[in-house]
Amino acid sequence: MLLPPEEPAFGPWTAMPATSLLESWRAKLPAPGLRPGVVAVDGRGGSGKSTFAAALARAVPWAAVVHTDDLAWHHAFFDWANLLRDGVLVPVHAGQAVEYRPPAWDARGREGAVVVPAGCPLLVVEGSGAARRGLMPWMDVVVWVQTDTGQAKARAMVRDGGTPEALAFWDEWMAEELPFFARERPWERADTVATGAPEVAHDPAEQVVVSAGR
């Protein structure tokens, strides 16, 4: 597996039901009814974070997913932690519903809001940088999604259309992502490490593939 030099290769990989993974975190999550449990799903661009987050959310009725890309939209690739903290995580920890519009949404006329409904049992915060050190007081569980860098880039190119503009965006993203993760090292805080490009046979509708050693 091709990875940046500071990131260790995890494994061996094993498939397990998403419900079983959630059960393994029981001691880390708040008691039902107090507030939503908050899970950070972090990983490099194109690693498979969104797919993993969706698998977790499917396993918990009424779970919510917040994508950090929605906070970063027309704001900054990585300098959005205060928006997530103040607009989403602080009210969630107070047991409040969230309907948050980041400043750029108003400035650029984007409709909708970042929503976490009242009574939501689980909030999955998905995105590169979700498990940074500064957000750890608001995260109950951390997942790092690891994928070969070549596979991640190829996946991102397919997702974004493979145009010259998409490639230029990828290069701009990587210019910030590489030093950010070299500093932050979120895999060192991970309760679970998952693979975003599993070669282990599994049912993607119900199972996730995680490192047996983490």
Task: Pin down the residues of each PLM region.
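NTP-dependent small-molecule kinase module
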Residues: 1-32, 137, 158, 182-214
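Conserved nucleotide-sensing/catalytic segment adjacent to the nucleotide-binding pocket
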Residues: 64-125
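P-loop (Walker A) phosphate-binding loop of NTP-binding proteins
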Residues: 44
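Conserved lysine of the Walker
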Residues: 49
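ATP-dependent NMP and nucleoside kinases share a basic, alpha-helical "lid"
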Residues: 113-159
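Conserved AAA+ ATPase "sensor/coupling" helix adjacent to the nucleotide-binding pocket
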Residues: 87-91, 158-163
